[in-house]
Amino acid sequence: MTFRPLHDRVVVKRLESEEKTKGGIIIPDSAKEKPQEGEIIAVGPGGRDESGKLIPLDVKAGDKILFGKWSGTEVKIDGQDLLIMKESDILGVVG
């Protein structure tokens, strides 16, 4: 199935969380927090201003981003756990 987000929404795949701490302690699945970093899979065309002019998004597919803990809506597409969120939920692009 293909999915194309509308307006100023983006589809994000979470990056895998760390299995170990820097000190070498293994973190069990039950203690892991969901990562707040992901990769953009797809972007919508953008939002519109008051005059109806299309405003393109600042992010593109392939960008690695940071987002808030409670950002987005979790969905499952083709067996992949993904997030759909507005561009305004994105905190920044990781360079």
Curated annotation (Swiss-Prot):
Compartments where found: Cytoplasm
CDD domains the UniProt entry points to: cpn10
Record SMART domains: Cpn10
Protein's GO biological process: chaperone cofactor-dependent protein refolding
GO molecular function: ATP binding; metal ion binding; protein folding chaperone; protein-folding chaperone binding; unfolded protein binding
Keyword entries, A-Z: Chaperone, Cytoplasm
Recorded superkingdom: Bacteria
InterPro entries tied to this protein: Chaperonin_GroES, Chaperonin_GroES_sf, Chaprnonin_Cpn10_CS, GroES-like_sf
Keyword Cytoplasm set for record: yes
Gene Ontology CC annotations of this record: cytoplasm
Keyword flag Zinc: no
Predominant cellular place of this UniProt entry's protein: cytoplasm
NCBIfam families registered for this protein in UniProt: PRK00364.1-2 (NF001527), PRK00364.1-5 (NF001529), PRK00364.2-2 (NF001531), PRK00364.2-4 (NF001533), PRK00364.2-5 (NF001534)
Stated role: Together with the chaperonin GroEL, plays an essential role in assisting protein folding. The GroEL-GroES system forms a nano-cage that allows encapsulation of the non-native substrate proteins and provides a physical environment optimized to promote and accelerate protein folding. GroES binds to the apical surface of the GroEL ring, thereby capping the opening of the GroEL channel.
Protein family per UniProt: Belongs to the GroES chaperonin family.
Known partners and oligomeric status: Heptamer of 7 subunits arranged in a ring. Interacts with the chaperonin GroEL.
UniProt-recorded name of the protein: Co-chaperonin GroES
Organism annotation: Beijerinckia indica subsp. indica (strain ATCC 9039 / DSM 1715 / NCIMB 8712)
Gene coding for it: groES
